Amino acid sequence: MSVCEVKARKGLIRVKVVIDEDRIANVSITGDFIVLPEDSVFEAESRLIGVRATESEVRAALASALSGASMTGVTVDDFVDAVMCAVRGEKG
C-alpha cells in the first residue's frame, strides 16, 4: 500500500492505494477537505476500483464521480495529483 498527502488550496488530501497488475485494487481518500455531499468521496473511491493506474483513466473516474459535488478549496486536479502521487509511491 502506498500513501501520499497533497496540500490543496484549502485542505490536505491523503490517498492510500493498492495496485495490482497496473490497476487500482483498493483506495482510500481521506483528509481535511470539504466535499459535499460527503458520499461523493465514497463514490470516487468506488469508481477508482479496477481502473488502470494511468493519469487519464484516474482523471476520468474522478471527474465523473465528483461532477455533481460542491468542493471548497479543492479541485478534481488536486484529487488526481494525490492519487497519482500514491500510485507512483511518492510521499507528497
Predicted features by range, described:
Residues R9-L12, L62, V76:
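Generic hydrophobic/packing signal
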Residues I24-L62:
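A hydrophobic, small-residue-rich beta->alpha segment in the mid-to-C-terminal subdomain
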Residues S64-G92:
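C-terminal structural segments of small proteins and small subunits
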Residues K10, P37-D39, D78:
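Solvent-exposed, flexible loop/coil residues
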Residues M1-R23:
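Structured beta-strand/loop patches that form or line metal/cofactor-binding pockets in enzymes
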Residues M1-S2, E21-D22, T54-E57, A69:
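Generic structural signal for short, solvent-exposed loop/turn connectors between secondary structure elements
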